[in-house]
A protein has these predicted regions:
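K/E-rich alpha-helical interaction surfaces of small helical-bundle regulatory domains
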Residues: 66-76, 106, 230-234, 241
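Alpha-helical bundle segments that constitute or directly flank the non-heme di-iron/ferroxidase center
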Residues: 39-44, 58-88, 151-164
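Acidic, carboxylate-rich catalytic segments that either coordinate divalent cations
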Residues: 219-246
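Serine/threonine-rich intrinsically disordered cytosolic regulatory regions enriched
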Residues: 4, 9-10
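Short alpha-helical hairpin
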Residues: 14-18, 33-59, 78, 203-211
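Active-site-proximal alpha-helical scaffolds that flank and shape metal-associated catalytic sites
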Residues: 25, 69, 93-197, 226, ...
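Hydrophobic alpha-helical segments
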Residues: 15-30, 139-140, 149, 234-237, ...
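Structural helix-adjacent loops and short alpha-helical linkers that scaffold large soluble proteins
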Residues: 89-94, 214-219
Length: 246
């Protein structure tokens, strides 16, 4: 049996094998302050019927397949956005930012190169996005085009932090079906504190940038972050509403 293809196995881990020591952002960091300020959005994601039905092991496989294929559109756009971002970063002035953005881009490429074959698709253009998924990817692309590079990483925090977080919340609740068909998916997103290290890398870089550059606009960053969070909520809210599932 071939290895199951998941986000976590391909692009969610930004750490090379020999670099596992990642400090957790401080409690007063932008990373945690903005998350807990808007934790109501995260909790709404947890409570979506898609994830709750999935947790019970009863989600129609049609819906799972539809969202997985739809999510690939986001992943292909993310790879393109991050490659364009590299052109905006001065590698000598901001080596850490460049390195992280480059690793993120490479990880998306790794996932994307496997996805088409795994799901028997001819090309990435075969995927027709919903308006929400298109707008989500466009939001991150626009941030890359019109804002300083650090804000693009802010836009990607929900992608890297929310997924392990909501998986942890769901797995620790009563009613979670450990023998369900989707147990591997939740375990692929949350496997202890290591699940959060990639998001922490982004958070620590933002904290360092904020301390050194003194040009980090928290109000702007929060607006970008919340917009990404709301797109995540919309994606999961709509995920079991498309005709074709039972």
């Amino acid at each position: 049996m071939r290895e199951l293809l998941t986000r976590a196995s391909s692009f969610m881990s930004l750490l090379p094998a020999d670099e596992q020591a990642v400090p957790e952002p401080s409690p007063n960091s932008f990373f945690y302050r903005v998350f807990y300020k808007h934790i109501d959005i995260a909790n709404k994601v947890v409570d979506t019927s898609y994830l709750q039905t999935m947790a019970a092991g009863k989600l129609c496989p049609d819906y799972y397949g539809q969202l997985t294929v739809l999510d690939s559109y986001y992943c292909y756009r993310a790879a393109d956005t991050l490659k364009s971002l590299l052109c905006k970063i001065d590698q000598e002035d901001n080596p850490k930012l460049y390195k992280l953005a480059n690793v993120m881009s490479q990880k998306y490429d790794k996932y994307n190169s496997t996805f088409l074959d795994y799901w028997h698709l001819r090309e990435s253009d075969s995927v027709t996005p919903t308006k929400t998924m298109h707008d989500y990817a466009e939001h991150e692309h626009n941030v890359m085009c019109y804002e300083d590079p650090i804000y693009t990483l802010v836009a990607y925090i929900p992608c890297y932090y929310l997924w392990p977080w909501f998986s942890q919340q769901i797995m620790e609740r009563d009613g979670y079906n450990k023998d369900g068909i989707y147990d591997y998916w939740f375990k692929g997103n949350y496997y202890g504190k290591d699940s959060y290290k990639s998001a922490w890398l982004i958070g620590d870089l933002i904290e360092e940038w904020e301390a050194i550059e003194k040009t980090f606009d928290e109000a702007k960053a929060e607006e970008i972050y919340v917009k990404s969070m709301n797109y995540e909520l919309q994606v999961f809210t709509e995920a079991d509403k498309k005709e074709g599932g039972q």
